[in-house]
Amino acid sequence: MGRVVGIDLGTTNSVIAVMEGGKPMVIANAEGVRTTPSVVGVSKTGERLVGELARRQLVLNPRNTFANIKRFIGRRYDELTDESKRVPYTVRRDPEGNVRIVCPQLSREFAPEEVAAMILRKLAEEASRYLGEPVTGAVITVPAYFNDSQRQATRDAGRIAGLEVKRILNEPTAASLAYGLDRRDNQTILVFDLGGGTFDVSVLKVGNGVFEVKATSGDTQLGGNDFDRRIVDWLAEQFLEAEGIDLRRDRQALQRLIEAAEKAKIELSGVSVTDINLPFITATEDEPKHLETRLTRSEFEALCEDLLERMMRPLRRALKDARLQPQDIDEVVLVGGSTRMPMVQQLVRSLIGREPNQNVNPDEVVAIGAAIQAGILAGEVKDILLLDVTPLSLGLETIGGVMKKLIPRNTAIPVRRSDIFSTAENNQTMVEIHILQGERQLAEGNKSLGRFKLTGIPPAPRGVPQVQVSFDIDANGILQVSALDKTTGREQTVTIQGASTLSQEEVKRMMKDAELYAQQDRQLKARIEKRNRAQTLIAQSERRLREISLDFGLYFAESKRRRIESTIRELKDYLERQDDRGLDLALAELQDALFDLNQETAARLRDEEGEGFFEPLKQTFASLRGDGNRDFERSWDDRGGDRWDADPWDRSRRSTPSYGYDDRRSPVSDPYRGERWVEEQTSMSRREPVRDRNGGNGSVRPEPAPRRGRPTWEEDQPPRRDRSSQPPAKPASGRRWNDGWDDDDDEWF
């Protein structure tokens, strides 16, 4: 059982949220950002990019990068305005009159639903990565003024993305859920939603867990992008007047203008003037051209006066349909990033007479509300009742091309309405039912949702047969129409699908294509990650070899180092040849070789640490065992001897008597006078003096003499004795050793 999430599929940005611990939480994408650009692109290598990666190539690859897809979803080509068609990529009409997006890189065309499905799949994958479990269902939000065509197209996009669309939710309603979740007092809320490509106004009654939509209105062809286009046109006209070049005819220059306009719009929300600098915007045969100008907030507001007037009409209509006055509104909730513009906030203040509530994040509040609705459907959130409405009137065409409304706008859903119709001619055996959506009186001025025929009507005079037509709208706002001949009982039922511009066969084909391309994308991503991992491991291995050479020398672990160097050469060769199989083997081999080298290095470090830090402990334990004489010190002693030599005090190992210091002799300044030397077991080591404080019987070990540093061989120091019977060489003529030895002890030799 997978998780159900809430998705705000926006024109400019999209957001995904989920219920965690009973509270909604927005999920950040792989880039660490909570909003994902609603942009899809195809790179020059054929890789499909979604989000920020696609947005980065808008200027360099405008023909293969698609933004603002939400404006085309669920619409036919003839319904598009000239403004919406003015995009850097190619939008064309297919033989059925639907909108198709041309992708030159892949030499194919995409339906807007397919492009939207790529965005939804990207969001679902990010949520699955965060949650650690698959995401199978979603509540997707749409503008409240979306017609049935656009709602059905959004549902199809979710199906193509591999998601079960649990609910299609109006964006203002979702925002009210997020705003009023913890509020128990009765309030009247006005939600002002100005997104990147759509505009909605909804009036709701909120209290005690009940969210009742009273009225909704809007404009699906008005949004923040229209404000950007005003700046684009202003910049293009200025440049055309100064240089005689229309930048709107150049795809790359147009995209740079769009990005500069969006940046200027954002900056003017916080400052009163902004500078626009676009170097090398174009070039002539003589020289490159630059665009440098300054735009003030007052000039920007003057450019957008007509857009503000277009927003006033839906706002007043929503209040009128709800039978409310501006003073009846308790709270105004702003939704959408474009509501940050000061002129929009001032418009709300002037019409409502109340300061807008800015406690909610306008970019995330819709996704949070969608997550709450997902929690309601999953049983995680209780005691909440949502009563939504249909945004537009629904009816059918009658005699004379007049629209007969069966369900008026702002009717609470789900709802079912019926009416009785008859034939227009004598002996008519078939009637065609034409479903319409809109507010115009004539059928041709409204949106056609579809047609179907009811056949088998018995011949009869005009007006005698009775045909009952029923309209049924579910909680998602999806319409189902049925026609019943009351004479014969013959019934014809149809779910309106023509609104989506896609047949069921096309939807299934796109679902298979999306899964196929998703698998190809995963394989390509895995190859790229493998190559990156190999390059990273090569760099780490080379750095490790350099460090070991500096720390332990060139001859340390020579065989293991040669193995690593050889594997690195093989790995680089596989990378150059793009041999995936060899790359896997070389990667595993290099990891094993590096592990072996690190093990040997760690062992060497442990040995060195043991000789240093743990040496005093070793000496202590050795002295407790009684064998510490030999390991007492490793440095030179005061007589020039090495403490690691054989123990000269152990009389049990030889029969040679030892001699001690003669206390009976008068003290002399010579430190070696009066001492006796014993023969050592190693001929190459120096003699150790033995001084006995108890009369020379050797029963008590003398205390060591204080250190005097490492001795140097002077004339007054004793020579190295040889155990052989040969006497030492005589000194040079005129010189004699002052060794302090008793000449009477000739038996020593």
UniProtKB/Swiss-Prot annotation:
Protein's UniProt keywords contain Membrane: no
Alphabetical list of SUPFAM superfamilies matching this protein: Actin-like ATPase domain (SSF53067), Heat shock protein 70kD (HSP70), peptide-binding domain (SSF100920)
UniProt keyword S-adenosyl-L-methionine, yes or no: no
Biased composition (Basic and acidic residues): 643-653, 661-694, 711-724
Acidic residues bias locations: 740-749
PROSITE patterns: HSP70_1, HSP70_2, HSP70_3
One Gene Ontology molecular-function label: ATP binding
CDD domains xref list: ASKHA_NBD_HSP70_DnaK-like (cd10234)
Region ranges (Disordered): 643-749
A Pfam entry, by short name: HSP70
Keyword field: ATP-binding, Chaperone, Nucleotide-binding, Phosphoprotein, Stress response
Domain of life: Bacteria
Phosphothreonine PTM sites in chain numbering: 198
Known function: Acts as a chaperone.
Protein family according to the UniProt entry: Belongs to the heat shock protein 70 family.
Protein name according to UniProt: Chaperone protein dnaK3
Naturally occurring in which organism (per UniProt): Synechococcus elongatus (strain ATCC 33912 / PCC 7942 / FACHB-805) (Anacystis nidulans R2)
Protein encoded by which gene: dnaK3
